[in-house]
Curated annotation (Swiss-Prot):
Function comment: Catalyzes the ATP-dependent amination of UTP to CTP with either L-glutamine or ammonia as the source of nitrogen. Regulates intracellular CTP levels through interactions with the four ribonucleotide triphosphates.
Family classification: Belongs to the CTP synthase family.
Positions bound to CTP: S23, D158, I159, E160, K198, T199, K200, P201, T202, Q203, K234
Quaternary structure and partners: Homotetramer.
Note: CTPSs have evolved a hybrid strategy for distinguishing between UTP and CTP. The overlapping regions of the product feedback inhibitory and substrate sites recognize a common feature in both compounds, the triphosphate moiety. To differentiate isosteric substrate and product pyrimidine rings, an additional pocket far from the expected kinase/ligase catalytic site, specifically recognizes the cytosine and ribose portions of the product inhibitor.
Organism from which the protein derives: Thermus thermophilus (strain ATCC BAA-163 / DSM 7039 / HB27)
Domain Glutamine amidotransferase type-1: 302-549
Positions of the UniProt region annotated as Amidoligase domain: 1-277
Highest taxon above the source species: Bacteria
Gene: pyrG
UniProt xrefs under InterPro entries: Class_I_gatase-like, CTP_synthase, CTP_synthase_N, GATASE, GATase1_CTP_Synthase, P-loop_NTPase
Protein name: CTP synthase
Length: 550
Protein backbone atom coordinates (compact mmCIF):
# COMPACT_ATOMS: atom_id res chain seq x y z
CA UNK A 1 0.00 0.00 0.00
CA UNK A 2 0.95 3.62 -0.06
CA UNK A 3 3.51 4.52 2.56
CA UNK A 4 7.24 4.34 3.18
CA UNK A 5 9.16 1.46 1.64
CA UNK A 6 10.61 0.33 4.98
CA UNK A 7 7.29 0.27 6.83
CA UNK A 8 6.83 -3.42 6.04
CA UNK A 9 3.72 -5.11 4.67
CA UNK A 10 0.45 -3.81 6.02
CA UNK A 11 -2.51 -6.04 6.79
CA UNK A 12 -5.06 -6.47 4.03
CA UNK A 13 -8.19 -4.34 4.34
CA UNK A 14 -11.76 -5.58 3.83
CA UNK A 15 -14.81 -3.45 3.03
CA UNK A 16 -18.21 -5.16 3.24
CA UNK A 17 -21.19 -3.57 1.52
CA UNK A 18 -24.73 -4.57 2.50
CA UNK A 19 -28.12 -3.28 1.42
CA UNK A 20 -31.32 -2.53 3.27
CA UNK A 21 -35.04 -1.76 2.92
CA UNK A 22 -35.41 -2.94 -0.70
CA UNK A 23 -33.30 -4.72 -3.31
CA UNK A 24 -31.95 -3.21 -6.53
CA UNK A 25 -30.72 -0.05 -4.83
CA UNK A 26 -27.44 -0.12 -6.73
CA UNK A 27 -25.01 -1.93 -4.43
CA UNK A 28 -23.10 -3.07 -7.50
CA UNK A 29 -22.58 0.50 -8.69
CA UNK A 30 -21.64 1.61 -5.17
CA UNK A 31 -19.13 -1.25 -4.89
CA UNK A 32 -17.70 -0.40 -8.31
CA UNK A 33 -17.54 3.31 -7.54
CA UNK A 34 -15.78 2.82 -4.22
CA UNK A 35 -13.35 0.46 -5.92
CA UNK A 36 -12.67 3.10 -8.57
CA UNK A 37 -12.02 5.75 -5.90
CA UNK A 38 -9.55 3.46 -4.14
CA UNK A 39 -7.85 2.50 -7.42
CA UNK A 40 -7.56 6.21 -8.24
CA UNK A 41 -5.57 6.54 -5.00
CA UNK A 42 -3.09 3.90 -6.15
CA UNK A 43 -4.30 0.89 -4.14
CA UNK A 44 -4.52 -2.63 -5.52
CA UNK A 45 -8.23 -3.38 -5.24
CA UNK A 46 -10.46 -6.31 -6.04
CA UNK A 47 -14.22 -6.73 -5.68
CA UNK A 48 -16.26 -9.82 -4.82
CA UNK A 49 -20.00 -10.30 -5.33
CA UNK A 50 -21.86 -12.63 -2.97
CA UNK A 51 -25.12 -13.95 -4.42
CA UNK A 52 -27.24 -15.75 -1.82
CA UNK A 53 -29.17 -17.83 -4.37
CA UNK A 54 -28.67 -21.61 -4.41
CA UNK A 55 -27.67 -21.72 -8.09
CA UNK A 56 -24.01 -22.56 -8.58
CA UNK A 57 -23.70 -19.70 -11.07
CA UNK A 58 -25.83 -17.39 -13.20
CA UNK A 59 -25.38 -19.36 -16.42
CA UNK A 60 -28.80 -21.01 -16.58
CA UNK A 61 -30.94 -18.13 -15.28
CA UNK A 62 -33.53 -16.40 -17.44
CA UNK A 63 -32.38 -12.97 -18.68
CA UNK A 64 -35.80 -11.52 -17.83
CA UNK A 65 -35.29 -12.55 -14.21
CA UNK A 66 -31.60 -11.97 -13.66
CA UNK A 67 -30.37 -9.81 -16.52
CA UNK A 68 -27.15 -10.43 -18.39
CA UNK A 69 -24.83 -13.34 -17.75
CA UNK A 70 -21.35 -11.83 -17.62
CA UNK A 71 -18.47 -14.08 -18.73
CA UNK A 72 -15.02 -13.73 -17.17
CA UNK A 73 -11.69 -14.42 -18.85
CA UNK A 74 -11.43 -17.83 -17.16
CA UNK A 75 -14.86 -18.87 -18.44
CA UNK A 76 -17.10 -18.28 -15.43
CA UNK A 77 -20.74 -17.35 -16.03
CA UNK A 78 -21.36 -14.70 -13.40
CA UNK A 79 -23.67 -12.01 -12.10
CA UNK A 80 -23.84 -8.83 -14.16
CA UNK A 81 -22.30 -6.86 -11.28
CA UNK A 82 -18.97 -8.55 -12.08
CA UNK A 83 -19.14 -6.64 -15.36
CA UNK A 84 -19.57 -3.38 -13.46
CA UNK A 85 -16.56 -4.24 -11.30
CA UNK A 86 -14.36 -4.99 -14.31
CA UNK A 87 -15.36 -1.79 -16.07
CA UNK A 88 -14.93 0.54 -13.08
CA UNK A 89 -11.75 -1.14 -11.81
CA UNK A 90 -10.34 -1.66 -15.32
CA UNK A 91 -9.17 -5.18 -14.51
CA UNK A 92 -9.99 -8.80 -15.32
CA UNK A 93 -11.67 -10.73 -12.53
CA UNK A 94 -12.16 -14.49 -12.20
CA UNK A 95 -14.75 -17.08 -11.21
CA UNK A 96 -13.77 -16.64 -7.58
CA UNK A 97 -15.05 -13.07 -7.63
CA UNK A 98 -18.66 -14.30 -7.75
CA UNK A 99 -19.58 -16.38 -4.71
CA UNK A 100 -22.96 -18.12 -4.42
CA UNK A 101 -24.77 -20.19 -1.81
CA UNK A 102 -24.75 -23.06 -4.29
CA UNK A 103 -20.96 -23.00 -4.59
CA UNK A 104 -20.44 -22.85 -0.83
CA UNK A 105 -22.80 -25.68 0.09
CA UNK A 106 -21.64 -27.85 -2.81
CA UNK A 107 -18.02 -27.48 -1.69
CA UNK A 108 -18.82 -28.22 1.96
CA UNK A 109 -20.88 -31.30 1.06
CA UNK A 110 -18.11 -32.60 -1.20
CA UNK A 111 -15.56 -32.10 1.59
CA UNK A 112 -17.80 -33.97 4.00
CA UNK A 113 -18.12 -36.87 1.54
CA UNK A 114 -14.34 -37.01 1.20
CA UNK A 115 -14.00 -37.21 4.97
CA UNK A 116 -12.23 -33.87 5.35
CA UNK A 117 -14.20 -32.95 8.47
CA UNK A 118 -13.06 -36.05 10.37
CA UNK A 119 -16.52 -37.23 11.48
CA UNK A 120 -17.57 -33.80 12.76
CA UNK A 121 -21.20 -32.73 12.67
CA UNK A 122 -21.17 -30.35 9.71
CA UNK A 123 -23.06 -27.14 10.51
CA UNK A 124 -23.63 -23.62 9.20
CA UNK A 125 -21.29 -22.37 11.95
CA UNK A 126 -18.39 -22.99 11.63
CA UNK A 127 -18.23 -25.01 8.42
CA UNK A 128 -20.31 -22.89 6.04
CA UNK A 129 -19.02 -19.59 7.44
CA UNK A 130 -15.43 -20.83 7.34
CA UNK A 131 -15.89 -21.84 3.69
CA UNK A 132 -17.18 -18.34 2.88
CA UNK A 133 -14.25 -16.65 4.62
CA UNK A 134 -11.74 -19.01 3.01
CA UNK A 135 -13.05 -18.22 -0.47
CA UNK A 136 -12.92 -14.46 0.09
CA UNK A 137 -9.35 -14.66 1.41
CA UNK A 138 -8.28 -16.93 -1.45
CA UNK A 139 -9.40 -14.41 -4.07
CA UNK A 140 -7.68 -11.60 -2.17
CA UNK A 141 -4.43 -13.55 -2.03
CA UNK A 142 -4.52 -14.74 -5.66
CA UNK A 143 -5.13 -11.21 -6.92
CA UNK A 144 -2.63 -9.63 -4.50
CA UNK A 145 -5.25 -7.15 -3.38
CA UNK A 146 -4.49 -4.56 -0.73
CA UNK A 147 -8.17 -3.72 -0.33
CA UNK A 148 -11.02 -6.19 -0.91
CA UNK A 149 -14.51 -4.77 -1.46
CA UNK A 150 -17.21 -7.40 -0.88
CA UNK A 151 -20.82 -6.84 -1.91
CA UNK A 152 -23.41 -8.99 -0.14
CA UNK A 153 -26.33 -9.42 -2.52
CA UNK A 154 -29.94 -9.26 -1.44
CA UNK A 155 -31.37 -7.29 1.45
CA UNK A 156 -30.54 -7.43 5.15
CA UNK A 157 -33.25 -9.56 6.73
CA UNK A 158 -33.40 -12.11 3.90
CA UNK A 159 -33.06 -15.62 5.29
CA UNK A 160 -30.69 -16.59 2.46
CA UNK A 161 -28.16 -13.95 3.50
CA UNK A 162 -27.75 -14.97 7.14
CA UNK A 163 -24.70 -17.28 6.75
CA UNK A 164 -22.90 -14.60 4.72
CA UNK A 165 -23.69 -11.86 7.23
CA UNK A 166 -22.37 -14.08 10.02
CA UNK A 167 -19.20 -14.74 8.01
CA UNK A 168 -18.52 -11.05 7.42
CA UNK A 169 -19.28 -10.33 11.09
CA UNK A 170 -16.53 -12.79 12.01
CA UNK A 171 -14.08 -10.97 9.73
CA UNK A 172 -13.83 -8.10 12.22
CA UNK A 173 -13.11 -10.60 15.00
CA UNK A 174 -10.47 -12.29 12.82
CA UNK A 175 -8.84 -9.26 11.17
CA UNK A 176 -9.36 -6.44 13.66
CA UNK A 177 -11.42 -3.28 13.63
CA UNK A 178 -8.90 -1.18 11.71
CA UNK A 179 -8.78 -3.71 8.89
CA UNK A 180 -12.51 -4.13 8.32
CA UNK A 181 -15.25 -1.69 7.40
CA UNK A 182 -19.00 -2.17 7.13
CA UNK A 183 -20.84 0.06 4.66
CA UNK A 184 -24.63 -0.10 4.47
CA UNK A 185 -26.62 1.18 1.48
CA UNK A 186 -30.22 1.94 2.31
CA UNK A 187 -33.27 3.66 0.87
CA UNK A 188 -34.52 7.02 2.11
CA UNK A 189 -37.79 7.61 0.25
CA UNK A 190 -38.97 11.12 -0.52
CA UNK A 191 -42.72 11.71 -0.20
CA UNK A 192 -43.93 14.26 -2.71
CA UNK A 193 -47.19 14.84 -0.84
CA UNK A 194 -45.54 15.92 2.41
CA UNK A 195 -42.28 17.06 0.77
CA UNK A 196 -40.10 15.22 3.25
CA UNK A 197 -37.53 12.42 3.43
CA UNK A 198 -38.54 9.41 5.53
CA UNK A 199 -35.72 7.92 7.60
CA UNK A 200 -37.64 5.29 9.57
CA UNK A 201 -37.01 2.47 7.02
CA UNK A 202 -33.27 3.14 7.31
CA UNK A 203 -33.42 3.08 11.11
CA UNK A 204 -35.17 -0.30 11.01
CA UNK A 205 -32.71 -1.65 8.45
CA UNK A 206 -29.72 -0.71 10.60
CA UNK A 207 -31.44 -2.22 13.64
CA UNK A 208 -31.86 -5.48 11.70
CA UNK A 209 -28.17 -5.40 10.77
CA UNK A 210 -27.24 -4.80 14.40
CA UNK A 211 -29.38 -7.80 15.27
CA UNK A 212 -26.90 -10.06 13.49
CA UNK A 213 -23.96 -8.36 15.20
CA UNK A 214 -22.91 -5.79 12.60
CA UNK A 215 -22.80 -2.06 13.35
CA UNK A 216 -22.30 -0.16 10.08
CA UNK A 217 -19.38 2.27 10.00
CA UNK A 218 -20.67 4.18 6.98
CA UNK A 219 -24.15 4.72 5.56
CA UNK A 220 -24.98 5.65 1.98
CA UNK A 221 -28.53 6.90 1.51
CA UNK A 222 -30.20 6.19 -1.83
CA UNK A 223 -32.92 8.57 -2.87
CA UNK A 224 -34.39 10.12 -5.97
CA UNK A 225 -32.87 13.46 -4.95
CA UNK A 226 -29.94 14.58 -2.77
CA UNK A 227 -30.52 13.96 0.94
CA UNK A 228 -29.87 17.24 2.80
CA UNK A 229 -27.37 17.60 5.62
CA UNK A 230 -29.97 17.88 8.39
CA UNK A 231 -31.58 14.59 7.35
CA UNK A 232 -28.19 12.89 7.27
CA UNK A 233 -27.45 14.16 10.78
CA UNK A 234 -30.76 12.74 11.96
CA UNK A 235 -29.94 9.35 10.41
CA UNK A 236 -26.50 9.40 12.05
CA UNK A 237 -28.03 10.11 15.46
CA UNK A 238 -30.56 7.28 15.31
CA UNK A 239 -28.20 4.68 13.80
CA UNK A 240 -25.12 5.39 15.92
CA UNK A 241 -22.99 6.29 12.88
CA UNK A 242 -20.57 9.24 12.85
CA UNK A 243 -22.27 12.29 11.23
CA UNK A 244 -19.45 12.64 8.72
CA UNK A 245 -19.94 9.03 7.66
CA UNK A 246 -23.47 9.37 6.25
CA UNK A 247 -23.53 10.08 2.51
CA UNK A 248 -26.17 10.80 -0.10
CA UNK A 249 -26.46 8.88 -3.36
CA UNK A 250 -29.20 10.50 -5.46
CA UNK A 251 -30.32 9.21 -8.83
CA UNK A 252 -28.02 10.50 -11.58
CA UNK A 253 -28.26 10.57 -15.35
CA UNK A 254 -24.99 8.73 -15.97
CA UNK A 255 -23.46 5.89 -13.92
CA UNK A 256 -19.99 7.39 -14.20
CA UNK A 257 -21.12 10.40 -12.18
CA UNK A 258 -21.43 8.24 -9.05
CA UNK A 259 -17.71 8.02 -8.14
CA UNK A 260 -17.35 11.78 -8.58
CA UNK A 261 -20.45 12.52 -6.52
CA UNK A 262 -19.32 10.29 -3.65
CA UNK A 263 -15.77 11.65 -3.72
CA UNK A 264 -17.08 15.19 -3.63
CA UNK A 265 -18.87 14.35 -0.38
CA UNK A 266 -15.76 12.75 1.12
CA UNK A 267 -16.54 9.03 0.96
CA UNK A 268 -13.03 8.11 -0.18
CA UNK A 269 -11.42 9.96 2.71
CA UNK A 270 -13.90 8.47 5.20
CA UNK A 271 -12.92 4.97 4.07
CA UNK A 272 -9.22 5.83 4.31
CA UNK A 273 -9.74 7.18 7.81
CA UNK A 274 -11.75 4.17 8.99
CA UNK A 275 -9.13 1.76 7.65
CA UNK A 276 -6.17 3.69 9.01
CA UNK A 277 -4.85 4.67 5.57
CA UNK A 278 -3.00 7.85 4.78
CA UNK A 279 -4.86 10.53 2.86
CA UNK A 280 -4.20 10.39 -0.88
CA UNK A 281 -5.57 12.75 -3.53
CA UNK A 282 -7.22 10.56 -6.19
CA UNK A 283 -6.62 11.01 -9.91
CA UNK A 284 -10.16 11.25 -11.29
CA UNK A 285 -9.33 13.14 -14.49
CA UNK A 286 -10.65 10.39 -16.77
CA UNK A 287 -13.98 10.10 -14.96
CA UNK A 288 -14.41 13.87 -15.05
CA UNK A 289 -13.74 13.99 -18.79
CA UNK A 290 -16.02 11.00 -19.48
CA UNK A 291 -18.91 12.65 -17.64
CA UNK A 292 -18.27 15.92 -19.46
CA UNK A 293 -18.52 14.15 -22.84
CA UNK A 294 -21.66 12.27 -21.77
CA UNK A 295 -23.34 15.47 -20.66
CA UNK A 296 -22.10 17.68 -23.50
CA UNK A 297 -21.48 15.46 -26.56
CA UNK A 298 -20.42 16.98 -29.84
CA UNK A 299 -22.79 14.70 -31.77
CA UNK A 300 -25.61 12.22 -31.18
CA UNK A 301 -26.21 8.99 -33.10
CA UNK A 302 -29.02 6.45 -32.86
CA UNK A 303 -28.37 2.70 -33.00
CA UNK A 304 -31.07 0.03 -33.33
CA UNK A 305 -30.66 -3.12 -31.25
CA UNK A 306 -32.76 -5.89 -32.77
CA UNK A 307 -33.05 -8.37 -29.94
CA UNK A 308 -35.21 -10.83 -28.07
CA UNK A 309 -35.13 -9.31 -24.57
CA UNK A 310 -35.74 -5.65 -25.46
CA UNK A 311 -38.14 -5.16 -22.54
CA UNK A 312 -35.29 -6.00 -20.15
CA UNK A 313 -32.30 -3.78 -21.06
CA UNK A 314 -30.22 -5.37 -18.27
CA UNK A 315 -30.10 -8.48 -20.48
CA UNK A 316 -27.78 -6.46 -22.75
CA UNK A 317 -26.00 -4.44 -20.06
CA UNK A 318 -22.39 -4.89 -21.25
CA UNK A 319 -23.52 -4.20 -24.81
CA UNK A 320 -25.02 -0.88 -23.74
CA UNK A 321 -21.90 0.01 -21.79
CA UNK A 322 -19.65 -0.85 -24.76
CA UNK A 323 -21.72 1.49 -26.94
CA UNK A 324 -21.41 4.16 -24.27
CA UNK A 325 -17.62 3.68 -24.15
CA UNK A 326 -17.43 3.92 -27.94
CA UNK A 327 -19.53 7.06 -27.79
CA UNK A 328 -17.15 8.66 -25.29
CA UNK A 329 -14.21 7.76 -27.55
CA UNK A 330 -16.00 9.39 -30.50
CA UNK A 331 -17.15 12.30 -28.31
CA UNK A 332 -20.74 11.41 -29.11
CA UNK A 333 -23.89 10.32 -27.31
CA UNK A 334 -25.21 6.95 -28.45
CA UNK A 335 -28.98 6.62 -28.26
CA UNK A 336 -30.46 3.13 -28.45
CA UNK A 337 -33.67 2.27 -30.26
CA UNK A 338 -34.97 -1.05 -28.99
CA UNK A 339 -36.51 -3.17 -31.75
CA UNK A 340 -38.31 -6.41 -30.90
CA UNK A 341 -36.84 -8.91 -33.35
CA UNK A 342 -40.07 -10.90 -33.45
CA UNK A 343 -41.96 -7.81 -34.66
CA UNK A 344 -39.55 -7.48 -37.60
CA UNK A 345 -40.77 -10.72 -39.15
CA UNK A 346 -43.73 -8.85 -40.66
CA UNK A 347 -42.79 -5.21 -40.10
CA UNK A 348 -42.16 -2.41 -42.59
CA UNK A 349 -38.37 -2.25 -42.22
CA UNK A 350 -38.15 1.26 -43.68
CA UNK A 351 -40.35 2.40 -40.82
CA UNK A 352 -38.67 0.21 -38.17
CA UNK A 353 -35.19 1.54 -39.03
CA UNK A 354 -36.25 4.97 -40.31
CA UNK A 355 -34.24 7.10 -37.89
CA UNK A 356 -31.24 4.88 -37.10
CA UNK A 357 -27.65 5.00 -38.36
CA UNK A 358 -26.58 1.51 -37.33
CA UNK A 359 -28.11 -1.91 -36.67
CA UNK A 360 -26.80 -4.23 -33.98
CA UNK A 361 -27.95 -7.85 -33.56
CA UNK A 362 -26.83 -9.14 -30.14
CA UNK A 363 -26.22 -12.63 -28.81
CA UNK A 364 -29.06 -14.89 -27.75
CA UNK A 365 -30.56 -18.35 -27.82
CA UNK A 366 -33.74 -19.95 -29.17
CA UNK A 367 -35.79 -19.65 -32.34
CA UNK A 368 -38.10 -16.79 -31.34
CA UNK A 369 -37.44 -13.69 -33.43
CA UNK A 370 -34.78 -15.32 -35.60
CA UNK A 371 -36.39 -14.53 -38.95
CA UNK A 372 -36.82 -10.92 -37.86
CA UNK A 373 -33.10 -10.72 -37.13
CA UNK A 374 -32.35 -12.23 -40.55
CA UNK A 375 -34.46 -9.50 -42.15
CA UNK A 376 -32.58 -6.87 -40.14
CA UNK A 377 -29.22 -8.19 -41.37
CA UNK A 378 -30.48 -8.24 -44.96
CA UNK A 379 -31.75 -4.67 -44.65
CA UNK A 380 -28.40 -3.48 -43.29
CA UNK A 381 -26.49 -5.29 -46.04
CA UNK A 382 -28.64 -4.03 -48.90
CA UNK A 383 -29.04 -0.45 -47.62
CA UNK A 384 -25.37 -0.13 -46.67
CA UNK A 385 -26.27 0.66 -43.06
CA UNK A 386 -23.48 -0.12 -40.54
CA UNK A 387 -24.10 -3.56 -39.04
CA UNK A 388 -22.54 -5.21 -36.01
CA UNK A 389 -23.46 -8.81 -35.20
CA UNK A 390 -22.42 -10.23 -31.84
CA UNK A 391 -22.25 -14.04 -31.41
CA UNK A 392 -25.71 -15.01 -32.69
CA UNK A 393 -25.55 -11.79 -34.71
CA UNK A 394 -22.64 -13.25 -36.72
CA UNK A 395 -24.58 -16.46 -37.29
CA UNK A 396 -27.63 -14.47 -38.42
CA UNK A 397 -25.48 -12.56 -40.93
CA UNK A 398 -24.08 -15.84 -42.31
CA UNK A 399 -27.57 -17.35 -42.64
CA UNK A 400 -28.83 -14.25 -44.48
CA UNK A 401 -25.81 -14.16 -46.80
CA UNK A 402 -26.08 -17.88 -47.54
CA UNK A 403 -29.75 -17.59 -48.49
CA UNK A 404 -29.76 -14.34 -50.43
CA UNK A 405 -26.26 -14.04 -51.90
CA UNK A 406 -24.77 -17.55 -52.06
CA UNK A 407 -28.06 -19.04 -53.30
CA UNK A 408 -28.37 -21.67 -50.57
CA UNK A 409 -32.15 -21.77 -50.31
CA UNK A 410 -33.39 -22.76 -46.87
CA UNK A 411 -29.99 -22.24 -45.22
CA UNK A 412 -30.27 -22.10 -41.45
CA UNK A 413 -28.75 -23.11 -38.14
CA UNK A 414 -29.44 -26.57 -36.78
CA UNK A 415 -30.31 -24.82 -33.52
CA UNK A 416 -33.44 -23.45 -35.21
CA UNK A 417 -34.07 -26.07 -37.91
CA UNK A 418 -32.46 -29.49 -37.36
CA UNK A 419 -33.53 -30.57 -40.85
CA UNK A 420 -32.32 -27.56 -42.83
CA UNK A 421 -30.93 -28.55 -46.26
CA UNK A 422 -27.98 -26.22 -45.71
CA UNK A 423 -26.76 -26.20 -42.08
CA UNK A 424 -24.41 -23.23 -42.48
CA UNK A 425 -24.45 -22.94 -38.67
CA UNK A 426 -24.03 -26.17 -36.73
CA UNK A 427 -23.28 -27.47 -33.26
CA UNK A 428 -19.57 -27.54 -32.50
CA UNK A 429 -18.29 -31.16 -32.52
CA UNK A 430 -16.99 -30.69 -28.96
CA UNK A 431 -20.57 -30.08 -27.85
CA UNK A 432 -22.04 -33.33 -29.21
CA UNK A 433 -21.22 -35.36 -26.10
CA UNK A 434 -21.92 -32.59 -23.60
CA UNK A 435 -24.52 -33.34 -20.94
CA UNK A 436 -26.21 -30.64 -18.88
CA UNK A 437 -26.31 -26.90 -19.41
CA UNK A 438 -24.37 -25.21 -16.62
CA UNK A 439 -20.85 -24.16 -17.61
CA UNK A 440 -20.71 -26.41 -20.68
CA UNK A 441 -20.44 -23.92 -23.55
CA UNK A 442 -17.27 -22.60 -25.15
CA UNK A 443 -16.56 -19.97 -22.52
CA UNK A 444 -13.99 -17.35 -21.62
CA UNK A 445 -11.04 -15.86 -23.47
CA UNK A 446 -10.10 -17.48 -26.80
CA UNK A 447 -7.58 -16.20 -29.36
CA UNK A 448 -8.66 -14.69 -32.67
CA UNK A 449 -6.16 -14.67 -35.54
CA UNK A 450 -7.01 -11.70 -37.74
CA UNK A 451 -6.43 -11.56 -41.48
CA UNK A 452 -4.30 -8.55 -42.54
CA UNK A 453 -5.98 -6.01 -44.79
CA UNK A 454 -9.44 -6.54 -43.34
CA UNK A 455 -11.74 -4.13 -41.53
CA UNK A 456 -11.16 -6.09 -38.33
CA UNK A 457 -7.39 -5.74 -38.68
CA UNK A 458 -7.78 -1.99 -39.11
CA UNK A 459 -9.90 -1.81 -35.95
CA UNK A 460 -7.57 -3.83 -33.70
CA UNK A 461 -4.28 -2.89 -35.33
CA UNK A 462 -2.86 -6.36 -34.63
CA UNK A 463 -3.07 -9.91 -35.95
CA UNK A 464 -4.02 -11.78 -32.79
CA UNK A 465 -6.28 -10.77 -29.90
CA UNK A 466 -8.15 -12.43 -27.05
CA UNK A 467 -11.91 -11.99 -26.75
CA UNK A 468 -14.58 -13.50 -24.50
CA UNK A 469 -16.90 -16.22 -25.81
CA UNK A 470 -20.15 -17.93 -24.86
CA UNK A 471 -21.57 -20.23 -27.53
CA UNK A 472 -22.24 -23.82 -28.64
CA UNK A 473 -22.76 -23.27 -32.37
CA UNK A 474 -20.33 -22.20 -35.08
CA UNK A 475 -20.13 -21.47 -38.79
CA UNK A 476 -20.11 -24.91 -40.41
CA UNK A 477 -16.58 -25.40 -41.81
CA UNK A 478 -18.00 -27.42 -44.72
CA UNK A 479 -19.60 -24.25 -46.10
CA UNK A 480 -16.79 -21.75 -45.53
CA UNK A 481 -15.11 -22.12 -48.95
CA UNK A 482 -18.40 -21.72 -50.80
CA UNK A 483 -19.41 -18.68 -48.78
CA UNK A 484 -16.03 -17.07 -49.41
CA UNK A 485 -16.36 -17.70 -53.15
CA UNK A 486 -19.72 -15.90 -52.99
CA UNK A 487 -18.01 -12.86 -51.45
CA UNK A 488 -18.12 -13.37 -47.70
CA UNK A 489 -14.86 -12.37 -46.00
CA UNK A 490 -13.72 -14.55 -43.10
CA UNK A 491 -11.57 -12.00 -41.33
CA UNK A 492 -10.63 -13.97 -38.18
CA UNK A 493 -10.41 -17.56 -36.99
CA UNK A 494 -9.34 -19.39 -33.86
CA UNK A 495 -6.15 -21.14 -34.93
CA UNK A 496 -5.63 -24.86 -34.52
CA UNK A 497 -9.05 -25.89 -33.22
CA UNK A 498 -9.66 -29.61 -33.73
CA UNK A 499 -6.56 -29.77 -35.89
CA UNK A 500 -8.28 -28.01 -38.82
CA UNK A 501 -6.15 -25.73 -40.90
CA UNK A 502 -8.87 -23.09 -41.24
CA UNK A 503 -9.87 -22.97 -37.59
CA UNK A 504 -13.20 -21.85 -36.15
CA UNK A 505 -14.71 -18.80 -37.86
CA UNK A 506 -14.42 -15.87 -35.44
CA UNK A 507 -15.35 -12.93 -37.66
CA UNK A 508 -16.95 -12.19 -41.02
CA UNK A 509 -17.33 -9.00 -43.02
CA UNK A 510 -18.25 -7.72 -46.48
CA UNK A 511 -15.91 -6.00 -48.92
CA UNK A 512 -18.45 -3.75 -50.63
CA UNK A 513 -20.00 -2.34 -47.47
CA UNK A 514 -18.88 0.64 -45.35
CA UNK A 515 -19.16 -1.39 -42.12
CA UNK A 516 -20.60 -4.90 -41.95
CA UNK A 517 -19.00 -6.99 -39.21
CA UNK A 518 -19.99 -10.16 -37.40
CA UNK A 519 -18.10 -11.54 -34.40
CA UNK A 520 -18.52 -14.94 -32.78
CA UNK A 521 -17.08 -13.47 -29.60
CA UNK A 522 -18.58 -11.03 -27.10
CA UNK A 523 -16.13 -8.09 -27.23
CA UNK A 524 -18.51 -6.05 -25.06
CA UNK A 525 -17.34 -8.08 -22.04
CA UNK A 526 -13.83 -6.63 -22.38
CA UNK A 527 -14.84 -3.06 -23.15
CA UNK A 528 -13.84 -0.54 -20.49
CA UNK A 529 -14.47 3.20 -20.18
CA UNK A 530 -10.71 3.78 -20.43
CA UNK A 531 -10.15 1.05 -23.07
CA UNK A 532 -13.24 0.80 -25.30
CA UNK A 533 -13.73 -2.23 -27.54
CA UNK A 534 -12.30 -1.60 -31.04
CA UNK A 535 -15.27 -3.17 -32.91
CA UNK A 536 -17.70 -0.95 -31.00
CA UNK A 537 -15.56 2.15 -31.54
CA UNK A 538 -15.46 1.40 -35.26
CA UNK A 539 -19.19 0.68 -35.38
CA UNK A 540 -20.13 3.98 -33.73
CA UNK A 541 -17.64 5.84 -35.94
CA UNK A 542 -19.23 4.24 -39.02
CA UNK A 543 -22.73 5.09 -37.77
CA UNK A 544 -21.71 8.72 -37.33
CA UNK A 545 -20.31 8.77 -40.88
CA UNK A 546 -23.50 7.18 -42.23
CA UNK A 547 -25.56 9.80 -40.41
CA UNK A 548 -23.55 12.61 -41.99
CA UNK A 549 -23.97 11.09 -45.47
CA UNK A 550 -27.70 10.63 -44.95
Amino acid sequence: MNGSADAGPRPRKYVFITGGVVSSLGKGILTSSLGALLRARGYRVTAIKIDPYVNVDAGTMRPYEHGEVFVTADGAETDLDIGHYERFLDMDLSRGNNLTTGQVYLSVIQKERRGEYLSQTVQVIPHITDEIKERIRKVAEEQKAEIVVVEVGGTVGDIESLPFLEAIRQFRFDEGEGNTLYLHLTLVPYLETSEEFKTKPTQHSVATLRGVGIQPDILVLRSARPVPEEVRRKVALFTNVRPGHVFSSPTVEHLYEVPLLLEEQGLGRAVERALGLEAVIPNLAFWQEAVRVLKHPERTVKIAIAGKYVKMPDAYLSLLEALRHAGIKNRARVEVKWVDAESLEAADLDEAFRDVSGILVPGGFGVRGIEGKVRAAQYARERKIPYLGICLGLQIAVIEFARNVAGLKGANSTEFDPYTPHPVIDLMPEQLEVEGLGGTMRLGDWPMRIKPGTLLHRLYGKEEVLERHRHRYEVNPLYVDGLERAGLVVSATTPGMRGRGAGLVEAIELKDHPFFLGLQSHPEFKSRPMRPSPPFVGFVEAALAYQERA
